[in-house]
Amino acid sequence: MQRTLVLIKPDAFERSLVAEIMGRIEKKNFKIVSMKFWSKAPRNLIEQHYKEHSEQSYFNDNCDFMVSGPIISIVYEGTDAISKIRRLQGNILTPGTIRGDLANDIRENLIHASDSEDSAVDEISIWFPETKMETDN
């Protein structure tokens, strides 16, 4: 079984889409291993999470958005969880995906999902330092 990190972003709460997003993932038979609700995530966690983008012009705006409201951090587990949840997440131009069907903006796009095994390990350690990472790959 492979583990991956998902963040449900502030716009999902603002638009009452949290259950819809989590339901789409649940219907694909992924198991929640750990979950935390953050009424306002600490900015240092957000900055650490997005550190690879720290030199980009959008970094501060993205961090501001991520601390603008509640988020949920979730560790999901399942076969090929990283690639399958990334496909389910999609992008705003791909119908049939979470972002394609529900997102309105490139930044305020409802969900983040780890894009690789290395990212999953790193991101899970940021949001769930107490969780041991186990993968099948």
UniProtKB/Swiss-Prot annotation:
Its EC number is 2.7.4.6. CDD domains: NDPk_I. PROSITE patterns: NDPK, NDPK_LIKE. It is an enzyme of class 2 (transferase). One of its GO terms (biological process) is CTP biosynthetic process. It comes from the Viruses. Gene3D superfamilies: Nucleoside diphosphate kinase-like domain. It catalyses: a 2'-deoxyribonucleoside 5'-diphosphate + ATP = a 2'-deoxyribonucleoside 5'-triphosphate + ADP; a ribonucleoside 5'-diphosphate + ATP = a ribonucleoside 5'-triphosphate + ADP. The active site is at 112 (pros-phosphohistidine intermediate). The keyword Transferase applies. ATP binds at residues 9, 58, 86, 99, 109. Belongs to the NDK family. This is Nucleoside diphosphate kinase. It comes from Acanthamoeba polyphaga mimivirus. The lineage of its organism: Viruses, Varidnaviria, Bamfordvirae, Nucleocytoviricota, Megaviricetes. The gene is NDK.
